[in-house]
Amino acid sequence: MRARGLVALAIAGVMAAAAPAFAQDGKKVLRMGWAQEPQTLSPFVDQDEEDFRVWSLNYDLLVNFSPEDLSPTPGIAESWEVSPDKRTVTFKLFEGHKWSDGQPITSKDVEYSLETFAPNSLLFGSYVENVTSIDTPDDLTVVIKTKQPDARIVGGLFAYILPAHVWGKQSVKQLTTSYKPTPPIVGSGPWIVSEIRRGRLIRMTRNPNFRGEKPAYDEIHWIKYGNTDAVERALTLGEIDVVPEVQQATFARLAKAPDVEAVQSSSPSFTQLTFNLCSEEICPDAKFDPAVQDRSVRQAIAYAIDRKRINEIASRGTAFEGHGLLPDYYKAFYEQPAEDYPLDVDKANQLLDEAGWERSDDGGVREKGGQRLSFDLFVRSESPANIQAARLVREMTQPIGVDFKVQVVSVDKLTEITTRKIDGKMAPDFDTFIWGWGGDPYDPGLLLNLLTTKAIGGSSDAFYSNPEYDRLYDQQSGEFDEARRKAIVKQMIDLAQRDLPYVVLTVDSALQAYRTDKLAEPKRVCPEPDGDITCDQVGYAAVAALEPVSAAAGGGGDDGGTSGLVYVLIAVAAGALLAAGLLLTRRRRADREAVELEK
C-alpha cells in the first residue's frame, strides 16, 4: 500500500510539473522517449540505433538521401560528377556553408572524415574500403578515387562529415578509446546536442547555421525512461510526443490508446541468434565453448528452432520469419536461400547423431569427447522480446540434447562481452547471444559486410571468416549491373546459410507511435508511401518536416518547453514504480550483471 501511495504522489508531481506553467519561453519542443540512451555519442566507437538517431540530426552526410525514395540529394555537397570509368567522383560543396559554431565547412572536413574518421571507426569503415585517394584542390572541391567502381560513393556513402577543427584536435588513439564529445556538439544538421544529462535527457537545440529550411521545432528532447513500459506509458499520459521504437509486446495496446497513432512499416532489420566463430589465429584469448564452432551443431539448432512461433510469441506477430542474412525488404536482391532450415526436429537429431554427439546416460544434454552441448546465451535486459526469444530457443532445443543457459545482461555489458580485446586482439567472451542489426534502407551492403573477415574488430559480431565470402563481397561491391550483382549476393547468402554464423530468427518491422493531439499527421517516408514517420537513422529530413498541431486543434507543441525539473520528477516516478514492482524489473549480479534463467 505504501509503495502505491508513493507512486501516486510521484505521478501527481510529474503531471503538475508538466503543466503549461513551464511553457513561458514559448519554444516548440518535440519530446521523444526511449529506454536506452547513447553510450558516448562518438561516431568513432558507438554503433547503436540510439546513437544514429542523434547523429543523423546533428551531422550531415556528403550526399543525403531523399526521404521520399532514398535517392541521392545534396548534403554537404551541392553537386557531383562521376567519371566515365566510374572510378572518380568530383564533389562541389555549398559555398558559405558553416558549422554551428560559425566556422566554414570546407573540403578539409570531408577529407578528415573519410580519411581519419571512417577508417578508424567501429562501423563506418566499409563505406570507404575502395577509396584510394581523396584530393582537395580547393576549399569547395573534393575528388574521390576508388580502386574499382563503387556505386556507394554517391548513392550510399553513409559516413558523417565531422568538423575537422574539433575532432582533429584529438589523436586517433584518444578518439577510439576514451574521447567523449561534450555539448555543444558542433554539427551541420538542423539541431545540435546542447545538453546531456546521463540517465535523463539529451537536449538538441536548433542550429542557427543550418543550410536548409528552418524546422518547426526549436528543440528536440530525448527523454530517458527506466524501461520500455515506462516509455510507452509516458506516451499515453502525454508526457512525450513520439516513441521512435515501440516494443512488439505493447504495439497492439498502444494502437488502441486514445490520441495515439501506432505506425507499422517494413524495415531492413532482423533479430538473430549469433554464434562465436572466432578462430584461434584471430582471437587467441577468446572464451567460448569449442562445440559452438561445430557446423553440424549450428545446423541442428537451426532445424530445431520454430521461427514462426518465435514471431508469434516474442514479437507478438509484428515481425516475419527470418530466411537468411538479407530481409526481403531488399526486393531487388532478395531470393530465398538454398537451405532455409524449416522446423524439423528429426533432422536436427539426425545431424547430431551423425556428428558423433551422443545422448548422456540420463537422455539429456549430448556429449562428445568430454564436451557437452551446453552454451551460454546472452540477451539484453532492455529487450523483453529478445528475452522471450531466448527462453523459446532454450525450450525448443532441449529435445535435441542442447542446453542453453540464458543470461540477461545490460546492453553495455553485452557490448563489453562481444567486443572484448586483449593485447590489441579480439577476445570475445561468449558462446551465443541474441541481438539484431538494421541495414541501410537503400542498399544491402552494410548487412553483407557484417560477415566479412575485414569487419572483425569492427561491425563483425560472429567473427566469421571465409575467403570465398570475402571474394564475393568485393566482387559485388564493384558491380553496377543489378542482375549480376543479385547473382553474386545470392552466392553469399547461400554460403552464410551453410555455415550459419547467424540463425536469423525474425525480420523485424519498424514500430512507432505518436500523439495525434501533439503532432500533425506526418508523412510515411523512407520510402513513401508506407515507410516510417521519422526516418531518423538515415537523415534529418523527415524529422525536420514534423510539425506540431495548431493551437486551435489542441495547442500542441508550445507546451513542450518542459523544464529540467519535470524530467527529474519523471525519473522519480519511474523509480517509485520500479520499487513497487509495477514495471519490468532487472536484477543484477555483481560479477556479470547477469541473471541466469533456469526456468
For every predicted segment, state its role.
Residues L505:
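Active-site-proximal polar cores
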Residues A19-A23:
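Sec/Tat signal peptide C-region and signal peptidase I cleavage site
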Residues G33-P84, E115, P184-G187:
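N-terminal lobe/hinge region of extracytoplasmic solute-binding protein
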Residues D25, K92, S126-Q170:
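Surface-exposed binding/hinge segments that line
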Residues Q24-L30:
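Cleaved targeting-peptide boundary
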Residues M1-V7:
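Bacterial N-terminal signal peptides that target proteins for export
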Residues A8-A17:
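Bacterial N-terminal signal peptides
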Residues Q24, E68, F94-G125, S133-T136, ...:
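Extracytoplasmic/periplasmic ligand-capture domains
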